[in-house]
């Protein structure tokens, strides 16, 4: 009886099978597009900001840092500080490069997804810097590599006179985000 009913209503059954197929295909497409959108938005944010993070807080107090560290909703806290700004080298005096310090969490976890290439190591000594080719070019130092030294006149916002120091390149990185920076030790 079911067999006879099935063959008698071929048109209806074909429409029903097509409707089920299209519904499954539509659900699959929606979920695929949705998941891809979320992944691509995260990738875009990493490439635009140069970090895998959700928030930035400037000028945090010690109490705010402790509150974030004790919060179960905060997964990681990376600290970054502006150590100064480049004023001149022997080759160029129109620089746009900053001197930045970052802690281990920021460099190893938050900044890592935005880095495409890293040679050498993060600065440990006071006179070491981790550079990008873009920052070296901005300072007129495009031919330098790991182990090379250069003299830089730099300033900070502490109201002191500009200082001159010889830095040694301990690493070179490339990736996304701001590239006109020299990472320095604490």
Regions found by a protein language model. Give the residues of each.
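Charged, alpha-helix-enriched surfaces in structured cytosolic catalytic cores
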Residues: 1, 32, 164
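Alpha-helical transmembrane segments
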Residues: 23-34
């Amino acid at each position: 009886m079911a067999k006879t009913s099935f063959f008698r209503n071929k048109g209806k059954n074909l429409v029903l099978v097509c409707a089920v197929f299209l519904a499954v295909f539509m659900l699959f497409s929606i979920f695929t597009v949705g998941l891809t959108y979320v992944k691509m938005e995260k990738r875009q944010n990493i490439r635009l900001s140069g970090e895998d993070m959700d928030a930035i807080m400037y000028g945090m107090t010690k109490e705010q840092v402790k509150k974030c560290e004790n919060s179960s909703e905060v997964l990681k806290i990376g600290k970054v500080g502006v150590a100064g700004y480049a004023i001149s080298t022997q080759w160029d005096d129109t620089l746009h490069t900053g001197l930045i310090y970052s802690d281990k969490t920021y460099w190893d976890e938050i900044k890592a997804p935005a880095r495409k290439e890293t040679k050498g190591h993060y600065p440990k000594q006071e006179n070491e810097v981790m550079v990008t080719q873009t920052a070296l070019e901005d300072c007129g130092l495009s031919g330098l590599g790991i182990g090379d030294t250069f003299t830089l006149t730099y300033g900070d916002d502490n109201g002191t006179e500009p200082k001159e120091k010889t830095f040694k390149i301990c690493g070179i990185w490339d990736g996304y985000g701001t590239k006109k920076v020299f990472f320095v030790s604490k």
